[in-house]
From Swiss-Prot:
Pathway named in the protein's UniProt entry: Isoprenoid biosynthesis; isopentenyl diphosphate biosynthesis via DXP pathway; isopentenyl diphosphate from 1-deoxy-D-xylulose 5-phosphate: step 2/6
Signal peptide span: none
Matching PANTHER family: 2-C-METHYL-D-ERYTHRITOL 4-PHOSPHATE CYTIDYLYLTRANSFERASE, CHLOROPLASTIC (PTHR32125:SF4)
Gene Ontology terms for molecular function: 2-C-methyl-D-erythritol 4-phosphate cytidylyltransferase activity
Source taxonomy: Bacteria, Pseudomonadati, Bacteroidota, Bacteroidia, Bacteroidales
Keywords, sorted A to Z: Isoprene biosynthesis, Nucleotidyltransferase, Transferase
InterPro entries: IspD, IspD/TarI, IspD/TarI_cytidylyltransf_bact, Nucleotide-diphossugar_trans
E.C. designation(s): 2.7.7.60
Top-level enzyme category: transferase
Annotated protein name in UniProt: 2-C-methyl-D-erythritol 4-phosphate cytidylyltransferase
Catalytic activity: 2-C-methyl-D-erythritol 4-phosphate + CTP + H(+) = 4-CDP-2-C-methyl-D-erythritol + diphosphate
Family: Belongs to the IspD/TarI cytidylyltransferase family. IspD subfamily.
Gene Ontology terms describing biological process: isopentenyl diphosphate biosynthetic process, methylerythritol 4-phosphate pathway
Site feature: Transition state stabilizer: 17, 24
Length: 222
């Protein structure tokens, strides 16, 4: 029997690098706030959506939903001071025995194929992340200089990072460490085992700078 599928969308950033007058998840992209594009991408593929937002953004989000007549069903949960705390808060309303895909709210171009592939492999493996091969040259910085490294041995990791919900909740019970940069690092530190990887879609960029936003607009309208 197929497990139910949940999306846990984390949108706690303030977008300082974007240089805008509002958090980047609320910036307009092709006529809609970025975050609405993200929820729209997941809605056909999941049984429920949990949206984690800072408490001081809740009223503004409700206002945007009314303004844009946004009707995708979702539950809003209060975020924490860090991404780690925000995901942990979101997991409190996700039941055991389901698959949960944790996704950055400012990745609005994730494809249906990437979402489905993460869930499908998580049914078998229990822990999955999408990634992309490196295309730039890499160098390692050390105290005595810097050195070229073999880029074929490295990938960049995207979201949605998808897990059996009870596994991820258990991992998030451990104390926070500064090197927890994503859900995979939290999971691996707790269980001592790697996640499975799939190739994600190249358009699944995280909107961090004005250039990212311009590229996303081009991709959506081309």
């Amino acid at each position: 029997m197929e497990q139910k599928r949940y999306a846990l969308i984390v949108a706690g950033g303030h977008g300082l690098r974007m240089g805008a007058d509002r958090p980047k998840q609320f910036l307009l992209l092709a006529g809609l706030p970025v975050l609405m594009h993200t929820l729209n991408r997941f809605a056909p593929h999941v049984d429920a959506i949990v949206l984690v937002l800072p408490t001081d953004h809740h009223a503004y989000w409700q206002e945007l939903c009314r303004k844009y007549d946004f009707s995708v069903s979702h539950r809003v949960v209060a975020g924490g001071n860090t991404r780690f705390a925000s995901v942990r808060n979101g997991l409190q309303v996700v039941p055991d025995g389901v698959l949960v895909a944790v996704h950055d709210g400012v990745r609005p171009l994730v494809s249906a194929e990437t979402i489905d592939a993460c869930f499908d492999l998580a049914e078998l493996k229990g822990a999955v992340a999408p990634c992309r091969p490196m295309t730039e040259s890499l160098r390692y910085y050390a105290t005595d200089g810097n050195y070229a490294v073999d880029r074929s041995r490295y990938v960049t990791v995207q979201t949605p990072q998808t897990f059996r919900s009870e596994w991820l909740r258990e991992a998030y019970r451990q104390p926070y460490e500064e090197y927890f940069t994503d859900d995979c690092s939290v999971y691996e530190h707790h269980f001592g085992r790697p996640v499975a990887l799939i190739v994600g879609n190249i358009e699944n960029i995280k909107l961090t700078t004005p250039l990212d936003l311009s590229l996303a607009k081009l991709l959506l309208t081309s």
